Regions:
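Glycine-aromatic micro-motifs
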Residues: 1-142
Length: 142
């Protein structure tokens, strides 16, 4: 992780803007591992530790990756990947598959220096019986 956060990247607002824009992506699970990101993107983007307020991370029964859902008075720690291109975002969409929906969220950099808009992947089924309470542990699956 970089010790100083790069300038925030503006997230594209409309589909016509997205082909040439760069994106911030908040990650909180398997994409925290640089090795996973490197395999997918063929590079490791600049990143900064961040917090997503108003969400909770869940373990998913039988899976090595977590899910997040909106839950008041909770927070998810992770990191923001900066400068993600549209083709790279498409790769993340395929990797995350249909179990997740890409959403725009506001995250706070962990050092408290600023808030910024980012994309993240939210579990699509908030009534999924396989969601387990208790935070997912990044170290356990790997």
């Amino acid at each position: 992780m970089s010790s100083t956060a790069p300038s925030p990247v503006v997230v594209a607002a409309s589909p016509s803007d997205q082909s040439h824009s760069l994106h911030n992506v908040f990650v909180y699970g398997s994409l925290l591992a640089d090795d996973v990101v490197r395999v997918l993107l063929k590079r490791i983007p600049q990143s900064s530790s961040a917090v997503l307020h108003g969400y909770q991370r869940f373990s998913v029964r039988g899976r090595v990756y977590p899910a997040i859902l909106p839950v008041e008075n909770n927070r998810v720690t992770g990191k923001v990947l900066f400068g993600i291109t549209k083709p790279e975002l498409d790769i993340f969409d395929i990797f995350e598959d249909v179990e997740y929906e890409r959403s725009v969220v506001e995250v706070s950099l962990a050092d408290g220096s600023e808030k910024l808009s980012a994309l993240t992947y939210v579990w699509s089924n908030n009534r999924d019986p396989d969601l387990l309470y208790g935070d997912w542990n990044f170290e356990m699956p790997f």
